[in-house]
A protein has these predicted regions:
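Interhelical loop segments of eukaryotic multi-pass membrane proteins
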Residues: 363-391
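Conserved C-terminal guanine-recognition region of P-loop GTPase G domains, centered on the G4
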Residues: 141-266
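Amphipathic alpha-helical protein-protein interaction segments
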Residues: 28-32, 71, 75, 88, ...
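Amphipathic alpha-helical interaction motifs in eukaryotic regulatory proteins
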Residues: 43, 96-100, 120, 192-196, ...
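C-terminal end of P-loop GTPase domains and the immediately downstream helical coupling element
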Residues: 228-370
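Conserved G1/Walker A P-loop phosphate-binding module
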Residues: 2-173
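Beta-strand cores of modular interaction/reader domains in eukaryotic scaffold and signaling proteins
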Residues: 81-83, 117-120, 169, 203, ...
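Conserved beta-strand elements of beta-rich interaction domains across eukaryotes
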Residues: 89-90, 123-125, 175-176, 208-210, ...
Length: 392
């Protein structure tokens, strides 16, 4: 029953997330930004081919999987994945709500987010649980290996079109804390696994007491081993530290703690951000929210370039494999022709040999007496006359 409900949820979500008629899809694409359209078009070329749902249209993946080719290709995602990590109460969920201009994630001082929540754009407000989420995001198959995680992965589908949200999948993560706090799964290992499958990682530090959380620092150190280029750091809730020298002190503490754990620390930046509201409207505090948005926009542009390059490379590899298979086929055809001609020649020679042997056997069996009489009565007298004439 649970699986049936998950399947029903998934089908409903997909119906409202992009699986529509060609006319509806064309109208929907016209409303998208250029980068969204490019990402969607690349995804469709891999999935359905250049003619979409038309009969006979074949996608790049299906071509690559042909038994004669077997070229390994990965389908690019049609959205940019943004992973947000940090200690609890760092403002991760609040930032997502602000970006999409919708209160879709629960926020508060308490540890509200105990699992991973995908926040994505669709045509109907929808909430998906673990089974449906894993079915919706097929690249999450490996995440199921973490015991206890399936019941703690969710998807929230929002109808928001704010900023570049239609091109983004936000991943809200559990707040990281030290001490006796127990998670129902290995949260650090799960974050590291997800980092392999995202395009951008935003790290938020809460300046009020938790910025130097040991668990957060360990996760950041591990992420820097493989994903240093994906990481962007921010001190969130800067408006809660009213005095400039207090903010500078917190920034220095965070920077010192991170300096020995991250790569390229000489280029390290830690801008301060806070979400604007009526209470801080007149605050004279630097707010780098626009930089966060620019980081996200940059990730979208880079993903577009990366997907275009990947598609070009995949098509080139398929083309080379096709040429290789055709050349191999021509070689085999030529060899088959040679073998056929050789076989025909041997067959003809065998028939000649059989005919000759049959003729010899026939002569030996039936014509020996006739030949002897012919020689004695005809050839021999003429030979005698010839020699007699010479002797005379």
């Amino acid at each position: 029953m649970q699986m049936m409900n998950a399947t029903k949820q998934l089908m409903n979500a997909k119906d409202h997330a992009g699986h529509t008629t060609d006319n509806q899809e064309k109208q929907f694409l016209e409303q998208k930004s250029p980068n969204e359209r490019i990402l969607k078009s690349i995804y469709d070329l891999y999935e359905r081919g250049p003619n979409g749902n038309q009969p006979g249209s074949v996608g790049i993946l299906e071509i690559a999987k042909d038994p004669l080719l077997v070229v390994q290709c990965w389908k690019p995602r049609k959205k940019v994945s943004v992973l947000i990590i940090g200690n609890h109460s760092a403002g991760k969920s609040s930032f997502i709500n602000w970006y999409i201009d919708e209160s879709i994630q629960t926020t508060g001082v308490a540890i509200e987010t105990r699992g991973f929540t995908y926040v994505t754009s669709g045509r109907k407000r929808e909430s998906l649980k673990g089974d449906a989420t894993f079915a919706f995001y097929d690249h999450l198959d490996g995440l199921e290996k973490f015991e206890g995680i399936q019941a703690n992965v969710f998807t929230e589908v929002s109808t928001s079109k704010e900023k570049n949200f239609p091109a983004i999948d936000f991943i809200d993560t559990p707040g990281l804390v030290d001490g006796e706090m127990e998670y129902p799964f290995d949260v650090s290992a799960a974050i590291l696994w997800l980092a392999d499958h995202v395009d951008l990682i935003l790290v938020f530090f809460d300046p009020i007491g938790q910025a130097l959380c040991g668990r957060t620092m360990k996760v950041i150190e591990a992420l820097n081993v493989k994903h240093a280029e994906k990481l962007s750091y921010y001190m969130s809730k800067a408006d809660q530290v009213e005095k400039e020298h207090d903010r500078q002190r917190v920034l220095i503490q965070i920077t010192q703690n991170l300096s020995g754990r991250i790569n390229n620390s000489h280029a390290f930046k830690l801008p301060t951000i806070y979400l604007p509201n009526e209470h801080n409207a007149n605050a004279n505090i630097p707010n780098a929210l626009s930089e966060v948005c620019e980081d996200i926009d940059k990730a979208i542009r880079l993903t577009v370039q990366k997907n275009l390059t990947a598609m070009k490379d995949d098509c080139a590899r398929i083309d080379r494999k096709v040429v290789e298979v055709l050349e191999e086929d021509r070689t085999k055809r030529a060899e088959n022709v040679k073998r056929s001609m050789r076989g025909a020649a041997l067959l003809a020679l065998s028939w000649v040999f059989i005919f000759f042997m049959t003729f010899v056997a026939f002569v030996e069996l039936f014509a020996f007496r006739f030949v002897g009489n012919f020689v004695r009565k005809t050839i021999m007298p003429r030979c005698n006359d010839f020699f007699a004439a010479i002797l005379m």
